[in-house]
């Protein structure tokens, strides 16, 4: 979905490709400067993480950052695995502002995250605020279990491959 799905405040979707992505829709969710405007439909940050886990492994990790955070447990940076989540706190500490999915390490050893970012849509990067993230692992996902699936004839055998596949694959994502 990287580069294919725009950010849309309040954007959620059922598993699989959604033909409504990129079509003009009214933003009805409260709490954003875009509320009441027409924008290309897509996913917000928590809608994206929910979509990835529902599509990739058939697991519901919770709705919204406020639902996903308590459905996860803290992990250290040394324990971080692809598929773990990073939460960015609200500036006043009242809750969680953003959620990202850890995708692995970049060429220079930097941690890479896939997420739906306001103004950019679904992206893969190492954001400037990365050191401020609360690192978490979804409680109801078995990170050691093989993941069923197929990508170009090769079985998908790890959550790392599956998360990468469903986040960036053009074959099954439009």
List each language-model region with its residue ranges:
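Low-complexity, Gly/Ser/Thr/Pro-rich intrinsically disordered linker/tail segments
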Residues: 129-157
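A general marker of short, structured functional hotspots
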Residues: 3-5, 65, 83, 125, ...
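N-terminal capping segments
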Residues: 1-46, 50-59, 114, 148-174
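Short, low-complexity, polar/charged sequence segments that are solvent-exposed and flexible
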Residues: 26-29, 107, 131-136
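...with weaker cross-activation on analogous glycine-rich loops/strands in unrelated enzymes
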Residues: 50, 54-129
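Residues at the C-termini of beta-strands that transition into short coil/loop
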Residues: 117, 139, 167
């Amino acid at each position: 979905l990287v580069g294919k799905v725009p950010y849309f405040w309040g954007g959620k979707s059922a598993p699989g490709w959604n033909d409504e992505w990129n079509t003009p829709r009214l933003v009805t969710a409260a709490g954003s400067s875009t509320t009441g405007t027409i924008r290309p439909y897509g996913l917000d940050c928590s809608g994206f993480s929910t979509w990835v886990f529902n599509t990739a492994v058939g697991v519901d990790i919770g709705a919204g950052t406020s639902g996903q955070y308590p459905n996860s447990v803290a992990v250290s940076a040394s324990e971080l695995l692809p598929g773990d989540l990073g939460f960015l706190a609200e500036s006043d500490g009242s809750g969680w502002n953003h959620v990202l999915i850890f995708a692995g390490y970049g060429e220079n050893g930097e941690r890479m995250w896939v997420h739906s970012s306001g103004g950019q849509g679904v992206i893969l990067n190492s954001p400037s605020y990365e050191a401020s993230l609360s690192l978490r692992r979804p409680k109801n996902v078995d990170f050691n279990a093989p993941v069923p699936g197929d990508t170009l004839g090769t079985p998908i055998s790890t959550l790392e491959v599956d998360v990468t596949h469903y986040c960036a694959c053009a074959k099954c994502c439009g």
